[in-house]
Amino acid sequence: KRLDDLGLGRTSVTIRGEADNPISPDPAVRAKGIENTKRAIDCAQAAGASALVGPFHSALGYFSGAGPTADEWKWGVESMRPVAEHAAQASVVLGLEAVNRFECYFVNTMADLTRFVRDVDHPNCRAMYDTFHTHIEEKNIPDAIRTVAPVLCHVHISENDRSTPGTGNVRWKENFDTLKEVGYDGWLMIEAFGLALPELVAATKIWRRMYQSEEQLARDGLAFMKSQYAQRW
């Protein structure tokens, strides 16, 4: 209610791990992944979030020692369909995320992600785009955005070192120009990591101070996004 009073929209994020991996060969583990993502959707709905985003198509940080198999792809699609239907009933859109090869082996590129979303084939299962991950995995940023554009619902604005957007070497002009070109008109969300949450420090491998304060990050990051938006939209 307080967020509503302030006029603030919100989104939410979730991940899966090895114990609830939606692409596990163990049906019980896959069922746990479905259950936990449905619970995350319920929490998002309770918080008034319009979207639940993240790489919850598979276990983050878990590696099989090989690339994705046909069975894993099938299990992933089958696991996501009931989750997407639950999201529809909750009026929550799912924004699946492709992450880099050092964090995930299942979905790394916008081509991978677009194929997965289309195979799930549910209107509440869509894709998100993250500038950090794409600058690791994609050869051509504009082409990557054009590939995912038909199923795109959410964008993470994230610097190459996870610090304040606009202070690193992400190709921001290419990103914003192409988002404008494809007609994107959804969320632009800062994703940055620092030292404030001890439980995230080890997970995100952040060992040094990335910005002066959370307030500085929010202020300067928002100003950067607004300046980019004002130049194009």
Show which residues each predicted segment covers:
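Aromatic-lined substrate-binding rim segments of carbohydrate-active enzymes
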Residues: 1-7, 15
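Histidine-acidic metal/acid-base catalytic patches
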Residues: 4, 48-50, 107-129, 134-233
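Active-site acidic/histidine proton-transfer and metal-coordination neighborhood
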Residues: 4-5, 22-126, 138, 208, ...
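Short phosphate-binding/catalytic loops that engage adenosine nucleotides
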Residues: 8, 92, 184
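Hydrophobic residues in well-ordered beta-strands that form the structural core
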Residues: 10-12, 53-54, 96, 129, ...
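Short active-site-adjacent helix-start/loop capping segments
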Residues: 11, 19-23, 198
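Generic beta-strand hydrophobic packing signal
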Residues: 11-15, 155
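Active-site-proximal loop/turn and secondary-structure-junction residues that shape catalytic pockets
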Residues: 16-19, 56-60, 98-102, 131-133, ...
